[in-house]
Regions:
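A generic local secondary-structure boundary/capping motif
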Residues: 89-90, 111, 193-197, 222-224
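Short, structured patches in soluble enzyme cores that scaffold and shape functional sites
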Residues: 124, 209-211, 237
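Short hydrophobic beta/alpha edge segments that flank linear recognition/processing sites
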Residues: 101-108, 144-146, 154, 183-199, ...
């Protein structure tokens, strides 16, 4: 079986010994994990869902199986970015009220090992999640959203862990559309935290600056601990 969430390609296999992890890394995966004996997760970031669909098309005979693919030993090329408008500093606010903690405490290696990028995590205490920066909605899903700022920096907000399992179960509601321009503090998503907890899933919410969009900029986290929604948490400069 092949599935995907907003960050990972999720594959169920019969024989784990036949999985070529190096090939997955050469194809652009930032990391490969084995959460269970017959599960393989490959961190392809926001490309995971597209790759899942391409694999399923091959399985269903809609696309030919390529047998002469040459794997690169270098990193995958980042998607084309719009022309950047340079600013000295970019402030990232808390998308929700709660407790700001290090990504190292997130029980998902995608975030705890900074495979997609750097940032912070927040244990939410409210159901409403707002845009942490101004920009364009470049990714929107039940449990996550991405915003690209005018200088090309991309921020991913991922509400909860493994919450892709709650898709179409009345837990999440998006208030924006792909391509929409939003201001900082605009309501983007609501989540029923009680339902997430009732399903024995973690509500911790990583807020990540994607590596490919960061370039040579530096990240400074200004505040940990209890914060209000819209508090200034992170500076990019």
């Amino acid at each position: 079986n092949v599935d995907a969430c907003i960050t990972k390609l999720r594959i169920q296999v019969v024989d784990p010994s036949k999985v070529n992890k190096q090939a997955l890394l050469q194809l652009g995966a930032k990391g490969v994990m084995n959460p269970s004996k017959q599960s393989v997760y490959a961190v392809f970031g926001t490309n995971a869902d597209r790759i899942k669909n391409e694999i399923k098309d091959i399985f269903n005979g809609k696309s030919p199986l390529l047998t002469n693919v040459v794997l690169s030993s270098g990193p995958a090329l980042a998607a084309a970015q719009p022309k950047k408008k340079h600013r000295k500093h970019l402030q990232v606010i808390a998308p929700v009220k709660g407790e700001v903690v290090s990504t190292k405490s997130v029980k998902d290696e995608t975030f705890s090992k900074d495979l997609m990028g750097h940032g912070f995590a927040i244990i939410p205490e409210s159901n409403e999640f707002v845009a942490p920066v101004s920009g364009e909605i470049v990714l929107v899903n039940n449990h996550a959203f991405g915003i690209r700022t005018e200088n090309g920096v991309e921020i991913l907000v991922h509400v909860g862990l493994d919450t892709v399992k709650l898709t179409n179960k009345g837990v999440f509601k998006s208030h924006v559309k792909l391509g929409q321009k939003v201001g900082v503090g605009t309501l983007v998503l609501t989540a029923d935290l009680d339902k997430i907890k009732a399903n024995k899933l973690d509500t911790i919410t990583p807020v990540i600056v994607l590596n490919e969009s960061l370039g040579k900029k530096k990240i400074i986290i200004k505040k940990f601990g209890q914060v209000n929604q819209k508090a200034k948490i992170l500076t990019i400069k």
